[in-house]
A protein has these predicted regions:
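Active-site- and interface-proximal helix/loop "cap" or "latch" segments in soluble metabolic
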Residues: 11-101
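Short, compositionally biased leader-like segments
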Residues: 1-9
Length: 101
């Protein structure tokens, strides 16, 4: 199998529904052998949140498109987990880079 599954984690605010259900925010990525994001899912409460997150990430390069993806999140994702998505993404990149060594 040439694909990798990587999960990044982040904390969310105490009053966030995700924290009440999961204690943390998780984003799982399936990455192909060329670094393309094939699929992504987050520990979001609403289905529409995951649908929106998928539109942001799928088809992008996991490493090279970090700045573009982060910018899109900051401009267009106005939910309470905005920063948590970016932190979880950074955590997933760290794990991805460690697995390459």
């Amino acid at each position: 199998m040439k694909e990798k599954y990587i999960v990044g984690t982040a904390k969310t605010s105490i009053d966030n529904a995700i924290t009440k259900n999961y204690n943390s925010f998780f984003v799982g990525f399936i990455i192909d052998e060329n670094g393309r994001i094939l699929d992504v899912e987050a520990s979001a409460i609403l289905k529409i949140t995951n649908d929106f997150i998928k539109k942001i990430f799928i088809g992008k390069d996991f490493i090279k498109d970090f700045d573009e993806i982060s910018s899109i999140i900051l401009k267009n994702y106005l939910g309470s987990s905005q920063k948590s998505i970016i932190v979880a993404y950074k955590d997933a990149i760290k794990k991805y880079n460690q697995s390459a060594n």
